[in-house]
Amino acid sequence: TDAGVSGYGCSWAIEFAESMGKAIIGEDPLNHERLWQKIYVPKFIGRRGTSCKTVSAIDIALWDIKAKVAGMPLYRLLGGFRERIPCYVAGGYYAENKGITQLQKEMEEYVSWGIRAVKMKVGALSLKEDARRVQAVRQVLGDDVKLMLDANCAYRFFEAIEFSRMVEEYRPYWLEEPVDADDYD
């Protein structure tokens, strides 16, 4: 900033970051939402993949600047007040030769560590196969462990609805990124 405050955000896409950064040089870094809209909405190089990761890096740098200017840690600037925060383990990823039994063993191991919430990957197999995976995981987790699902934008709108109905009885705590945020169809 012109006041000498630097914000840091990581991105391996230096060229994208430099291009987007030029669009906001000279702007008030505390006007965060306006700057975010300025680099995200015009679709500099698209709104997926590398471009989106670069917007995220700039966004993180802007939050870093805000916290430094305010003279406080970012969690406090965002209203944080807790002494403890809940956590979960992300797992259940697809791997060659990893079937239902291996998936169940993985989830059982997390529970043996004292974990009370797990997130698993869905979206790379058919809806029916992924629903079977969710059912199998719920069987080993029992009712007291939260189960979250992450599709990483794998579904079209109607597939997401269908999959949600298929797994509803297994009580997922949430279904993360079922569809692409920019898919308006």
Residue ranges with predicted function:
Residues R76-F81, Q104-G114, V134-D143, R165-E169:
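Acidic (Asp/Glu)-rich catalytic clusters
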Residues D59-A95:
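Glycine-rich, aromatic-flanked loop segments that form ligand/cofactor-binding clefts
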Residues D2-V69:
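Metal- or metallocofactor-binding catalytic centers and their adjacent structured scaffolds
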Residues M120, L125-D185:
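Catalytic core of soluble alpha/beta enzymes
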Residues F16, N31, L35, T54, ...:
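General structural feature for long, well-ordered alpha-helical segments within catalytic domains
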Residues G4, M20, I58, G71, ...:
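Conserved, mostly hydrophobic/aromatic
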